[in-house]
A protein has these predicted regions:
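Extracytosolic ligand-binding ectodomains
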Residues: 2-4, 15-18, 32-393
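Twin-arginine (Tat) signal peptide motif
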Residues: 4-19, 23-26
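Sec/Tat signal peptide C-region and signal peptidase I cleavage site
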Residues: 26-32
Length: 393
């Protein structure tokens, strides 16, 4: 029978060190996996909470897919995480959140889905060394020359020429401007009016209305219709925009509509009882109506992740933006070198598989804005038809 040596304090210490070494070796692969964080600052409470959640859901869906593929950056295994912070749609809160995201979570990129917050971050992001992933179509976002900004959707100005030509061809060249009165709508009108006139059109009435505070638009619409327009320019959030269209039809208007990109045709159709009242309207392509195979597959996958829900533009654009951002990190070989990551965004978008780029982003221009095609949609004979936005190839 073999006798065991007594466990002296020295032998116990030696055994403990050996066990620790074995445990460390076993845990090595797990410890080697770095966590790469992407920030999000947007509305997650208040009236715009659902909008902010739609954006975040698209981002989180992308991260789940990326992590399932065991990603590597710079030869190291990584896990991607989104760090979401609520800014209540308040730019000052966005700025506070960004400071926290960069200092505490070391985020190299922060996605913000509203222009006020984007502009707030652009005052400091180059100095603080983080990329602004900007989900807004306001042209000034990339016109300012910020070297660390990605504008995720196309500029809304890319819609003006093709949308105008479409309704002019179907209905005529007289337009009445009855959009909303908030800053974003004012920016749209300021760009749309000269674009319409450049094509030989005439603006016969201008009557902005408070879409966010009213549901009765009969008075404002009646004033515009008194000038006998062929087309109405409308736009704000989807529900009030739909009510403007509905009330215009009830007042006898038979013409077309240019719908600014804040409103979505499929969401409007649910308010007015289908596409028939929207006949002749043109706006951005609803994700739910895009018939491209890769888009239909995206809608199906989204429905499995979020049962009973249909994705909109907010989910789709930002889903692809996260895929592109991580791909840019991989191409740059770094999750922290923001200049190198930003420089690889064009190549990253171009290298994405169609299934993770259902919106068909073609790349990124020298100012940091995405390049797209076929994002317009019009209602003809009660159905959606695609309209090429050739101004932004």
């Amino acid at each position: 029978m073999t006798a065991f040596a007594p466990l002296t304090r020295r032998r116990v210490g030696t055994l403990a060190l050996a066990c620790a070494a074995v445990a460390a070796a076993a845990a090595g692969p797990a410890l080697a996996q770095e966590v790469v964080k992407i920030g999000y600052s947007g509305p997650l409470s208040g009236g715009a909470a659902q909008y902010g959640k739609n954006v975040l859901d698209g981002m989180q869906m992308a991260v789940s897919e990326i992590n399932a593929a065991a990603p590597e950056i710079g030869g190291k295994k990584v896990k991607i995480e989104i760090v979401p912070l609520d800014d209540k749609y308040n730019p000052s809160e966005t700025a506070i959140n960004a400071q926290r995201l960069v200092q505490q979570h070391k985020t190299a990129a922060i996605l913000v889905p509203h222009s006020g917050g984007i502009f707030a971050l652009q005052t400091t992001n180059e100095r603080s060394n983080f990329i602004v992933l900007a989900y807004s179509s306001v042209p000034q976002i990339t016109n300012r020359g910020n070297k660390l900004t990605l504008r995720i959707p196309p500029e809304f100005t890319s819609y003006i020429d093709p949308f105008s030509k479409y309704v002019m061809g179907r209905f005529g060249k007289k337009v009445a401007l009855v959009g909303a009165d908030h800053d974003y709508a004012k920016a749209w009108v300021a760009a749309f009016k000269p674009g319409w006139e450049k094509l030989g059109g005439t603006v016969v009435a201008e009557n902005a209305m408070s879409y966010n505070r009213a549901t009765d638009f009969y008075s404002g619409v009646s004033k515009a219709l008194a000038e006998k327009p062929d087309v109405l320019f409308v736009g704000g959030a989807s529900e009030p925009t739909a009510l403007v269209v509905k009330q215009a039809r009830e007042l006898g208007f038979k013409g077309g509509f240019v719908v600014m990109d804040q409103a979505k045709l499929d969401e409007m159709a649910r308010v007015v009882g289908g596409y028939a009242p929207l006949e002749g309207a043109i706006g951005v392509m609803p994700v739910s109506e895009d018939t491209k195979p890769e888009n239909k597959a995206f809608v199906e996958r989204f429905g499995k992740v979020y049962p009973g829900r249909i994705p909109g533009s907010e989910a789709q654009w930002n889903y692809t933006a996260v895929h592109a951002t991580v791909k840019a990190m991989q191409l740059a070989g770094s999750a922290s070198d923001t200049k190198a990551i930003h420089a690889k965004l064009d190549e990253a978008y171009k290298s994405l598989r169609p299934d993770v780029n259902p919106g068909g982003v073609k790349g990124v221009d020298e100012r940091g804005g995405t390049l797209t095609t076929e994002r317009g949609a019009a209602v003809r004979d009660g159905k959606i038809e695609a309209v090429m936005t050739v101004a932004n190839k």
